[in-house]
């Protein structure tokens, strides 16, 4: 399956380069040390340019983590919402600056656009401030596993064939997030913890559960067809790391609600992390040890070990 051709408008292209250009200057923070060192870091569905993007939490992760390669797996910039009205607060600016600074300091940063930043797909093969733009990619882990990296919207029939319905669904999702924000403000005042209305609805609606299962199966099958041992994707805002019919299926989650990332340790171990800025360490939600591409299943997660290294962020 190949992406549909998209010709960005001049406004789209201007906003894309403008969003990257705002990070041209240093972000004003100098991190003496990074707490965690990873071989690879995957992030998706950040949705910069929206009010529900948790940019401050992401910035905290970027300050504490160093990786040799960072893959931005789509929907990094929310072009759909920016077309409706420009929203770009300082925290979103800081995230862009941090990414560009990492690229300048030698980190390989690869941007794989999704449907919300599809305007960038015509820039395939180009570099902006050291950030490489690709439609998809193949990553080879330390233990030799080939992972196909793609946002995932190519496998969403609504996005590909009924874009008006996709935009309607996005509007309903934004409305749900707004309700969720108000609800959790009230819960916080009453002393209750965070609760996700959108995740609750996804789990209760039969069609949503069926859609997620089909999406995951299709991605795993396509990765195998491409002679890869697994796939890393985003799009559905559902963090996951497991085996499907022998193939690794990894979904980075999002930075709207779940605050999750996929990482590869130096030995090829894959971990799905949930980042909590106030916590002493990220929560490891799932883990696949080296060699899992051929034999293993997800194991009980272990906490990542803090490794103080010179920060290249």
Which role fits each region the language model picked out?
Residues 48, 77-78, 154, 238:
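Short active-site segment of divalent metal-dependent hydrolases/proteases
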Residues 40-42, 70-72, 148, 232:
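Residue-level marker for buried hydrophobic side chains located in beta-strands
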Residues 2-20, 34-39, 50-142:
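Core catalytic region of metal-dependent phosphoesterases/phosphodiesterases
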Residues 2-17, 133, 200-229, 239, ...:
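Non-catalytic terminal accessory segments
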Residues 129-136, 148, 153, 157-167, ...:
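Conserved beta-sheet core of the metallophosphoesterase superfamily
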Residues 140-143, 239, 243-313:
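Binuclear metal-dependent phosphoesterase catalytic core
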Residues 152-215:
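Active-site-proximal loop/helix segment associated with metal-binding centers of metalloenzymes
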